[in-house]
Amino acid sequence: MTSVTRKGIRIMAEIISGKVVSAAKREELKERVKALNEKGISTGLAVIIVGNNSASRVYVNNKKKGCEEIGVTSFEYALPEETSEAELLSLINELNNDNRVDGILCQLPLPKHIDEKVILNSIDPAKDVDAFHPVNVGHIMIGDFTFLPCTPAGIME
């Protein structure tokens, strides 16, 4: 424990290693996925990226690597910048109905000609990895933290 003083208030804080916590969480998830697989239940994450945003590409590659590390099947959909909103909605509809896909992540930002709100609202709330769908935001707002997206869940843990 470390003592920190801010504005005359003394706070006790514990310095943690993000790498250590993350490695432990990956091992825990790996075991959970393995247990599901042993029961004949497979897990899948669909990641959609539209365009060539380099920061988004890094994020998507990290998700793919993370899935591989813990045994989750990763489905990547790299679409060209000129993909229409209708085409993207069609893909999301297919993924919403695909039993191999448990989670859908549509990487933001989307090209300017695509309405992010329309796209995010089209993802099945039960498969909405980022919890951007109004149903999931509503659960979080009333204190129902049954499902939290990765970043807030990591911060709270």
What are these regions (language model features)?
Residues L45, C67-E82:
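Short beta-strand elements in bilobed, periplasmic/extracellular small-molecule ligand-binding domains
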Residues E69-V72, E94-N97, I123-A126:
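Non-catalytic terminal and connector segments of soluble metabolic enzymes
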Residues M12-I41:
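Positively charged, low-complexity intrinsically disordered leader regions
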Residues S42-G51:
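Short beta-strand segments enriched in small/hydrophobic residues
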Residues V50-K65, T146-E157:
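Glycine-rich phosphate/diphosphate-binding loop of Rossmann-like nucleotide-binding domains
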Residues M1-I11:
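Short, Lys/Arg-enriched N-terminal segments with co-localized hydrophobic residues
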Residues E87-N99:
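Short, well-structured alpha-helical segments in soluble
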Residues C106-E157:
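Anion-binding alpha/beta catalytic cores of soluble intermediary-metabolism enzymes, centered on
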